[in-house]
From Swiss-Prot:
Role: May act as a bridging protein that binds pectin and other cell wall polysaccharides. Probably involved in maintaining esterification of pectins. May be involved in the specific O-acetylation of cell wall polymers.
Main location: membrane
Lineage of the species this protein comes from: Eukaryota, Viridiplantae, Streptophyta, Embryophyta, Tracheophyta
Motif (DCXHWCLPGXXDXWN motif): 341-355
Underlying gene: TBL40
Originating organism: Arabidopsis thaliana
Annotated protein name in UniProt: Protein trichome birefringence-like 40
Amino acid sequence: MGLCFQLNLASLSLILFSSFPGLLAQSQQHFLGQNNTSLLSGGRCNLARGKWVYDSSYPLYSAFSCPFIDSEFNCQKAGRPDTNYQHFRWQPFSCPLPRFDGANFMRRMRGKKIMMVGDSLSLNMFESLACLLHASLPNAKYSLRRSQPLTSLTFQDYGVTINLYRTQFLVDVVQEKAGRVLVLDSIKQADAWLGMDVLIFNSWHWWTHTSGLQPWDYMREGNQLYKDMNRLVAYYKGLNTWARWINNNIVPSRTQVFFQGVSPVHYDGREWNEPLKSCNGQTQPFMGQRYPGGLPLGWVVVNKVLSRIRKPVHLLDLTTLSEYRKDAHPSLYNGISKDLDCSHWCLPGLPDTWNLLLYSSLTS
């Protein structure tokens, strides 16, 4: 996402914020107190507040031994010369974050189906979880079936299937006479998400793409066709369609639902007080007390929607801990192009911590 569009999006966001006065402060206070906590040792632990510490026992697996990493995330194979980014561990201030135990994960999830639903950030998290499990249980038999939009990884000895359903917006994109239409109030593809024991959703980055990078020509809500609209408003409408689907279709005793949270980008060094820089060449996390760039605008929308949803949805609030990791992107070592990638994440790397948050929630 380019800087020009980020600035344009910021100005357009005023329309959304004028509709929800005090939204950012209220959401931050509410969710830092509730959704980011996990029950550990009989108390409540806030996993979202902490710092990155160097740990020589990391990474938890090797980029060269995990068979699931796509070239776009395999930064070492693509020639990245430094490895420090692999050795940082997230340490919450109030408690330790449990270390990943693949055998325990499999015992808890035996016979269950997990599905991650979203874009390439969901792919990032899916491949990380696959690598963590493979490293913990290297002799476990597995089968992998890749297709579009569904990829399935089954660990046969445990009856555990981890699915990835690729969708950029959660709501539908359909071909109509006018062209490709992003339908803000339609979610027919969600039939494929039924029957899961665990669902982890994600969507944000594609809502900000413009011009040739956006995979639609028009937006539609009801019978009204739009050439474009405020992207935060569109995102809010789309997420509300998803929330209605959750309310109407999820039985909490059968299915646990998570929202992956908003993954930040690091194209603009002004966000961490290094003007004119990007993620390229970064070798250390941001170590300050508070990230200068603040929270992404999408984070505000996510929290607004989750605050009103009737069914339980646990927010994996990975945003702040990920904002500190300006060093953890593929940058120029993405294996597929010469374009700078400050959006996705190297593996092993930051998404392993996302999965530690998930692991903590599933096993605590």
